[in-house]
């Protein structure tokens, strides 16, 4: 779902340039995110397109391997497949289209049925990326197979039709509330842990991750035993990096990237500082601070916290 200023879709021009360099007789295989916003420019220049089949994503390596194996098949069989794309007029936020529950779960199963058909090498369904303000934002079904076979087109149309027919059944798997209502709801519950996801500032969805809006509400309601993971604020991290653990400092948090975001002033006590490992290198600095009963992980770069390990490496518990 890459979108580049003055270019538009990033993947299409990138693959088109690869095609220009390698020529028309070299196979090209592409592995894509489930939320890809696909274009005809991409489809006509790739021979193999494989998409993740999980959202949340747990099959990245499996998808890359599938694309690599099909690329090898192209070479061994001396075949140049082509891709067919059908785009139903649908655009869902990611929270409404998860693959662990129906109707999306059943649609993913249809991909495997399609691949049992002669003439179909691989089939992929894409939910699209709604937060990308682009003409190509939206759902798509891409099926690949040898040139001249009608099955890829037939299966792409069939699955896209099913996608459209099931459109009214998509909904939020978890409770959807306003931020303040979510906090009040959580305060009334004895069970723990309770996760509140700020879908409006979701780093994995392309957002800056610098909003302190939820933090300001948590402070307003004097919440205790809460972890905010995390907020991007390089100046705040740098300020605490000059402090010793246990030292208090008054800083403004938030609005460090997006001028339209929310900031709030806090007096925080430094609990721990260090580096967060991402992509095999420890290159993101963090500061774990305490503000009353709220712990906050501050980072100097955009950083998602999607696993328990991500959180524990900051010293937060």
What are these regions (language model features)?
Residues 1, 31, 35, 82-85, ...:
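Core alpha/beta catalytic barrel or barrel-like domain that forms the active/cofactor pocket
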Residues 44-47, 78-87, 131-135, 154, ...:
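Short, compositionally biased low-complexity segments
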Residues 64-68, 72-112:
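Conserved anion/nucleotide-ligand pocket segment
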Residues 95-301:
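Hard-cation-handling environments
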Residues 295-317:
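A C-terminal functional module that forms or caps the active site or interfaces directly
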